[in-house]
Amino acid sequence: LMDYLRMAERAGMDMSQDAVRWPKDLRAAHDRALAAELAVMADNNEYAASFREMSKRCAGLAWEKDGICIRVAERPSELVQEGNVLHHCVGGYSQSHAQGKIILFIRHSRRPDRSWYTLNIDTRTKKVIQLHGYGNEWANGKALKINKKVLAFVDDWRREVLDKWMLPQKPKKKEKAG
């Protein structure tokens, strides 16, 4: 219980609420507090500013077609959340994203907040590094196939958006007038 309470406090949870202080399911509350704490830490890690800058530079990669949309991850905590929901390891890719091997989220247009597929590309070579859905396409010991509509969407997106896109230059740091 003490471990959970420390994590909940560090994650910024409202400790005045009885439901936070005395959860009905301690294991589930512990897991939620851990995920929240990791998300807070991710948004404040040494790569967070570079991550957000790279995301802004790549905003032009957002696109929508036939009920599917794609957008760039905006904050490191989104990677942690994505990894938790889809049960894959994207949560540890903050540094890679900040360095140009970016993470994009593929969603149903009607549910853009709901995790579906995660795409990793190299902005310099414009190559797809990996595309994964739930559990890296493994469930109950069986390999699953990536949805054909998603594969077609990624092919169309590559042709219509990625191939024509150029990574904008880093914004120059403003010099202080002295």
Model-derived segments and spans:
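Glycine-focused motif/segment detector
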Residues: L1-G178
